[in-house]
């Protein structure tokens, strides 16, 4: 369902011009369709593909991501009331626009970058729409791409390891120990302890016989690793580095999306 509120024609034109990479023009036509991407988090109200044609024939295309407080999601009602405050603290819906407004983007180590943000529409109420670059994805997730992405994320982690990047860029701290001893311990690990989970055809088709063993071994090591993290310098991480949050419009151009968990 579209969540984009009315936008002034002049503002849409400015977005279109930035997306097309031109200074002047008029919009001849435009359209908007919901992305087929499934939204599974509480703070994303909608994802829309907005595109059109300028009067000189130039085409433009952007993604409009509309954010909301977690409490505005229909899924919030399924969370026990006693956990509401904690969920709202963990899922801060203003994090992502704050990151895009910060100076982090220009200082990311190459080849990592954010999508270009053309406009952030903030009416001061309970919806914010980020109008951003429609980033293509042309390379397969083969071993080379996993290496490139991992190296880019490693460079990010080491870029500011001697200071406090969270303070520098206005990022809010995130307690990863609480994430592990919360959702992972009480939901993910019990789910993956069942044979039925691993027998699911979609899962069985993509993991080998050692994957389950390795994952459970890693889970048992995490408390020790978390204790070690408490005494070493902290860098900066993306916080949600799943393949779905990365695009490669060209080989080696690593674009990270969804910076709401950066810390």
Q: What do these predicted regions represent?
A:
Residues 134-147, 155, 162-238:
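ATP-dependent phospho-/nucleotidyl transfer catalytic cores
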Residues 97-101, 150-157:
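Short, hydrophobic/amphipathic alpha-helical packing segments
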Residues 69, 122-124, 136-138, 242, ...:
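Short, solvent-exposed loop/turn segments at secondary-structure junctions
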Residues 66, 134, 259:
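Residues immediately flanking
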Residues 1-125, 249-254:
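Conserved NTP-binding catalytic cores of kinases and kinase-like/nucleotidyltransferase enzymes
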Residues 125-132:
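A conserved loop-to-beta-strand element in the N-lobe of protein kinase catalytic cores
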């Amino acid at each position: 369902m579209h969540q984009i509120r009315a936008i002034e024609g002049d503002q849409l034109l400015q977005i279109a011009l930035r997306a097309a990479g031109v200074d002047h023009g008029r919009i001849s036509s435009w359209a908007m369709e919901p992305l087929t991407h499934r939204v599974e988090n509480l703070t994303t109200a909608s994802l829309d593909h907005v595109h059109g044609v300028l009067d000189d024939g130039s085409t433009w295309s952007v993604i409009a991501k509309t954010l909301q407080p977690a409490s505005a999601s229909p899924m919030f009602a399924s969370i026990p009331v006693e956990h509401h405050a904690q969920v709202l603290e963990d899922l801060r819906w203003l994090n992502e626009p704050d990151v895009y407004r910060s100076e982090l983007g220009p200082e990311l180590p190459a080849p990592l970058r954010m999508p270009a943000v053309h406009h952030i529409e903030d009416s001061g109420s309970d919806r914010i729409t980020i109008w951003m670059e429609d980033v293509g994805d042309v390379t397969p997730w083969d071993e080379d791409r996993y290496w490139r992405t991992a190296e880019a994320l490693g460079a990010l982690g080491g870029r500011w390891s001697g200071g406090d990047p969270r303070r520098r860029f206005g990022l809010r701290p995130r307690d990863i120990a609480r994430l592990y001893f919360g959702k992972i311990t009480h939901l993910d690990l019990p789910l993956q302890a069942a044979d039925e989970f691993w027998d699911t055809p979609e899962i069985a088709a993509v993991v080998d016989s050692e994957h389950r063993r390795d994952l459970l071994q890693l889970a048992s090591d995490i408390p020790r690793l978390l204790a070690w993290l408490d005494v070493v310098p902290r860098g900066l991480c993306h916080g949600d580095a799943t393949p779905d949050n990365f695009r490669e419009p060209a080989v080696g151009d690593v674009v990270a999306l969804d910076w709401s968990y950066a810390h």
